[in-house]
């Protein structure tokens, strides 16, 4: 090995080990992945990328849709980093092209459109691409007469796109209304965290709203609310279980039971007489 080889950038090796965010136990990364990112020690549900969600929920031979719709730096926005540079870095390092990936496939032989958000892509924030992909996914569900399932995780609207990102709240809500008017079931699966403009738009417009255990779900953060109302909030405030007790979600379902639960709902809502 020469001196230049010594200084040359080495390929990044995958980490063999990881740590549970909840119980702090050290786990084999491969073990966590094969368990669909549910901690085998404490049952904590970690974030999972869209392609793993698709492999867990869908049968083989599904298609990925609308990948040609890509983000644009409309405003030449810069915070700690230029938005254009942030997108370029994500293009090189992320396994998704945006914070939402849309799949067309079958869930236990039932045709569905599946849209899945990715928190690792700028906090799962909703910008113009997320709004447009969700709209097109909903219209495809209407056109093909099959249910739309959306797995949601988000920090809210994408600040780098300013008012354009806020417009997506209206766009996605209208898309859900079109599905409702055409009798197409829309099911949302809320994962940790689901907050901000996404929770204030399509996330809570599902015909059935499912949440994963102990997910943080809400609009503003608990600390912001406490500072505003000057009151102490309940310890389990904004958790899936708290929202279930208050009637804001319909059921709390473990990730390993999600496919069977969705199959039962699809049979009940749409495919019973198929």
UniProtKB/Swiss-Prot annotation:
InterPro entries: AcCoA_carboxyl_beta (IPR034733), Acetyl_CoA_COase_Trfase_b_su (IPR000438), ClpP/crotonase-like_dom_sf (IPR029045), COA_CT_N (IPR011762), Znf-ACC (IPR041010)
Keywords: ATP-binding, Cytoplasm, Fatty acid biosynthesis, Fatty acid metabolism, Lipid biosynthesis, Lipid metabolism, Metal-binding, Nucleotide-binding, Transferase, Zinc, Zinc-finger
Gene3D superfamilies cross-referenced by the UniProt entry: 2-enoyl-CoA Hydratase, Chain A, domain 1
Cofactor annotation: Zn(2+)
C4-type Zn finger ranges: 20-42
GO molecular function, one term: ATP binding
Protein location: Cytoplasm
GO cellular component annotations of the record: acetyl-CoA carboxylase complex
Catalytic activity: N(6)-carboxybiotinyl-L-lysyl-[protein] + acetyl-CoA = N(6)-biotinyl-L-lysyl-[protein] + malonyl-CoA
Cofactor binding, per record: Binds 1 zinc ion per subunit.
GO biological-process terms attached to the record: fatty acid biosynthetic process; malonyl-CoA biosynthetic process
SUPFAM superfamilies: ClpP/crotonase
Binding site for Zn(2+): 20, 23, 39, 42
PANTHER family named among the record's database cross-references: ACETYL-COENZYME A CARBOXYLASE CARBOXYL TRANSFERASE SUBUNIT BETA, CHLOROPLASTIC
Family: Belongs to the AccD/PCCB family.
Protein's name in the database: Acetyl-coenzyme A carboxylase carboxyl transferase subunit beta
Upper lineage: Bacteria, Pseudomonadati, Aquificota, Aquificia, Aquificales
